[in-house]
From Swiss-Prot:
Sites where the protein binds Fe cation: 111, 115, 305
Cofactor: Fe(2+)
Annotated CDD domains: ASKHA_NBD_TsaD_bac (cd24133)
Keywords per UniProt: Acyltransferase, Cytoplasm, Iron, Metal-binding, Transferase, tRNA processing
Pfam families assigned: TsaD
List of residues binding substrate: 134-138, 167, 180, 277
Protein name as annotated: tRNA N6-adenosine threonylcarbamoyltransferase
Enzyme class, spelled out: transferase
GO molecular function, one term: N(6)-L-threonylcarbamoyladenine synthase activity
HAMAP family: TsaD
Gene3D superfamilies: 3.30.420.40
Entry keyword annotation includes tRNA processing: yes
Length: 346
C-alpha cells in the first residue's frame, strides 16, 4: 500500500509518499524559517497561511518524483497533533479532502510517534525493544518502546524542553532565529570550560529533566556582562554558547544512559530536532561504548518535522494492524495538546 503523508504541525510543510513494502518513495519539505526570522519566533497565523500556499505544490512534487498518480495512493495520513491548532488544521483538511475525493481511509498520526519511529527509516534499522530519547523544541522525553503503539514513559521535562533551552538561551545571547542551530554553530568557536553552568537534575536519580534553571543561569551571565553599559563580546558569546550546549548535552546523555541501565536495554534511538546536534551525537557515541550499546539516529534531513515520518508511522501502524482502513465519514478533529500515552495499542 502507498500512503501519502502530510505534516503541518508548526513551521514546516512536509509531504511524503511511503510504501508499506518498499519504504520511503519521495518526500518534499518547505521550511518557514526565513518568514519568521524578523519576528524572532513562529507566528501561528503566518504559519497557517504559508501551509495553505505550499501543501498542494509539494504534493504534486512528491507524486512526480515517486512516479505516482493519485490513483496509486491507498491511504492518506496527517499529523493530528500536538502542535499549533491552525497549522494542524491545514494538513488535516487537505488530507481529509483528498481521502474523501478518492474514497480512501485517512489516518491521523501523533506527531511524536512520527519522530519516535523516524530512525527506523535509516539502515541499520533498530530492533524493538529500545529506549527512545525524544528531544525537540517542545518536548523532551525518555520512552521505552516495545513495538509500534507500545510506549512507556520513563521520564520527561518538568519545565522547558531541551530545544526550548537552546532557543531561549540563544535569544538571551542575541543570536538569530532559529536559535538552537545558531547557538550550536557559534559553540564550535567557543571554550565551554570558561563558564561554569549548572546541570539541572543531573544527579537526581530519576529520568526527568529540568532546563529552566540553566536558562536562568545564562541570563545571569548575560546581565553580568552587560551591566553598566558593557556588552557581551564575540568570544564571550561563543564561550557561553559552548558552555550552554555542553550542559544540555551532558544532561541528555546522562539521563539516556541511566534509562538504558534501568531497563537493561542496549539500543538507544534519538529523535527530534535536537537529535541533529553534532555534539550530542558524538557524546552519546563515546558514552555508549562501555555499555556495549548502540545509538540510532534518523538521517539529518529527517530530524526536523517532515512528512516522511508521518507517512512512515502510518505505514508501520498499517503493518501492525493498528490503523483503521475503513473509509469513514471524514469528520475529524486535531489535538493541539495530546499525550503520547493516549495512542497505546490495546
Amino acid at each position: 500500500m502507498i500512503i501519502l503523508g502530510f505534516e503541518s504541525s508548526c513551521d514546516e510543510t512536509g509531504v511524503a509518499a511511503v510504501c508499506t513494502e518498499r519504504g520511503l518513495l519521495a518526500h518534499a519539505l518547505h521550511t518557514q524559517i526565513a518568514m519568521h526570522q524578523e519576528y524572532g519566533g513562529v507566528v501561528p497565523e503566518l504559519a497557517s497561511r504559508d501551509h495553505i500556499r505550499r501543501v498542494v505544490p509539494l504534493t504534486r512534487q512528491v507524486l512526480a518524483e515517486a512516479g505516482l498518480t493519485l490513483a496509486d495512493v491507498g491511504a492518506v495520513a496527517y499529523t493530528a497533533g500536538p502542535g499549533l491548532a491552525g497549522a494542524l488544521l491545514v494538513g488535516a483538511s487537505v488530507a481529509q479532502a483528498l481521502a474523501w475525493s478518492r474514497a480512501l481511509p485517512a489516518i491521523g498520526i501523533h506527531h511524536l510517534e512520527g519522530h519516535l519511529l523516524s530512525p527506523l527509516l535509516a539502515e541499520p534499522r533498530p530492533e524493538f525493544p529500545f529506549v527512545a530519547l525524544l528531544v525537540s523544541g517542545g518536548h523532551t522525553q525518555l520512552m521505552r518502546v516495545d513495538g509500534v503503539g507500545r510506549y512507556e514513559l520513563l521520564g520527561e521535562t518538568l519545565d522547558d524542553a531541551a530545544g526550548e533551552a537552546f532557543d531561549k538561551s540563544a535569544k538571551l545571547m542575541g543570536l538569530g532565529y532559529p536559535g538552537g542551530s545558531a547557538l550550536a554553530r557559534l559553540a564550535e568557536q567557543g571554550d565551554a570550560s570558561r563558564y561554569d553552568l549548572p546541570r539541572p537534575m543531573l544527579h537526581s536519580g530519576d529520568l526527568d529533566f529540568s532546563f529552566s534553571g540553566l536558562k536562568t543561569a545564562v541570563l545571569t551571565r548575560v546581565k553580568a556582562a552587560t551591566r553598566d553599559g558593557g556588552e557581551l563580546g564575540e568570544q564571550d558569546r561563543a564561550d557561553l554558547a559552548a558552555a550552554t550546549q555542553a550542559a544540555i548535552v551532558e544532561v541528555l546523555a546522562a539521563k539516556a544512559i541511566r534509562a538504558l541501565k534501568q531497563t537493561g536495554l542496549r539500543r538507544l534511538v534519538v529523535a527530534g530536532g535536537v537529535g541533529a546536534n553534532a555534539l550530542l551525537r558524538a557524546h552519546l557515541a563515546r558514552a555508549l561504548k562501555p555499555l556495549r550499546a548502540e545509538a540510532y539516529f534518523p538521517p539529518l534531513s529527517l530530524c526536523t518535522d517532515n512528512g516522511a515520518m508521518i507517512a512512515f508511522a502510518a505505514a508501520e501502524r498499517v503493518k501492525a494492524g493498528l490503523a483503521d482502513l475503513r473509509e469513514g465519514d471524514h469528520a475529524f478533529t486535531v489535538r493541539p495538546r495530546w499525550d503520547l500515552a493516549d495512542i497505546q495499542a490495546g
